[in-house]
Amino acid sequence: MFMPAPRERGGSCFWLLDRGLGSAGVALNSAAPEGVFPLDWSVLKATHGIFFKWMAWDQVVHMSFPEFQYAFTNTFPEEEQKKYYDRYVVPETGRIYFQAAFAQLDPHHATRVNFKNNERAPLLLTAGEFDHLIPPHVARSNYEHYKQSTARTDFQEFKGRAHLLIAQKGWEEVADYVANWLEQLPIQKG
């Protein structure tokens, strides 16, 4: 994809900003890249159905509704949980789960970033207070690693929020915070 100028980025890719692809990045409840140890009880509970499935690394996996409830929407009313499960959950390669959880063991270093990259664009990392998939302490550890760079790095924890915070009631608070953060940056709009 050709883009004439760097743009703001949001999403699940570990290395876009590290490679100079973007003028700013927002990592909403970001999975931990290589160097940040993400596993704890809540993460294991949220993903056990995938990690304990035989050969899931090389298979397409499908998250069950109870796994989705616990990992993504644990603070949502059940009718919203069902709506978002039906809307967003699709079969996915098991490889991405293993690469994120066991990044230190990945010989291909799919999630490696240069935390000390001083040329990296500004980065905002967020956490949801009640996120089971990427608990706040993992998100903070991620932030502490990225702060090794002199590039602007900020962190915001949203109180009362689960992992799927952008779909949760009151999502406007998150959107407004991100928009205000972006507007404060000295970014050339191109």
Give the ranges of each region predicted by the language model.
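Active-site nucleophile elbow and catalytic-triad environment of alpha/beta-hydrolase enzymes
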Residues: 93-115
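Alpha/beta-hydrolase-fold catalytic nucleophile elbow
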Residues: 26-29, 87, 159
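Conserved alpha/beta-hydrolase "acid-adjacent" motif
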Residues: 132-141
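Catalytic active-site module of serine/aspartate enzymes centered on a nucleophile-bearing elbow/loop
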Residues: 149-190
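Flexible "cap/lid" loop of the alpha/beta hydrolase fold
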Residues: 22-58, 98-105
